[in-house]
Amino acid sequence: MNLEAQISKIVEANGAALYDIETANEFDETIYRVLITKTGGVNLDLCATISNELSPFLDVHPPMNGHYRLEVSSPGIERKLSKPIHFQNAIGEKVKVKLLGGDKLKGVLKAADDKGITVETKQGEESYSYSDLGTVKTYFEW
């Protein structure tokens, strides 16, 4: 079983689901970020519990060479969409899309399947395959 599957098992044992795993460098520090979701929301106690269970596991099965800081959190209201399941769960939400060619668009995610997405923009519905997409994020108008 690979590392992501093992992490997912630990997360699911606590009633949550693994959303994504990211590695980031912030302020000369490497962060290994485990993003989780749960129906009804994610709270600090859940993040702490999962972090406390993941930490000894990752001490034995390090996710990378060198020092890192483990962070367990929700992906947030404005979150990156990268897997087909992320897009399928975000149907009806507002998204910002940056295409690989550099073009950008905003709209409402209308559909998503295993091949691509459809976004309702001011110009109408536009469909893209996943291979056309650069970065896609949900956004919230404050």
Curated annotation (Swiss-Prot):
CDD domains: YlxS_C. The keyword Cytoplasm applies. One of its GO terms (biological process) is ribosomal small subunit assembly. Pfam families: DUF150_C (PF17384), RimP_N (PF02576). It comes from the Bacteria. InterPro entries: Ribosome_maturation_RimP, RimP_C, RimP_C_sf, RimP_N, RimP_N_sf. Required for maturation of 30S ribosomal subunits. NCBIfam families: PRK00092.4-1 (NF000936). This is Ribosome maturation factor RimP.
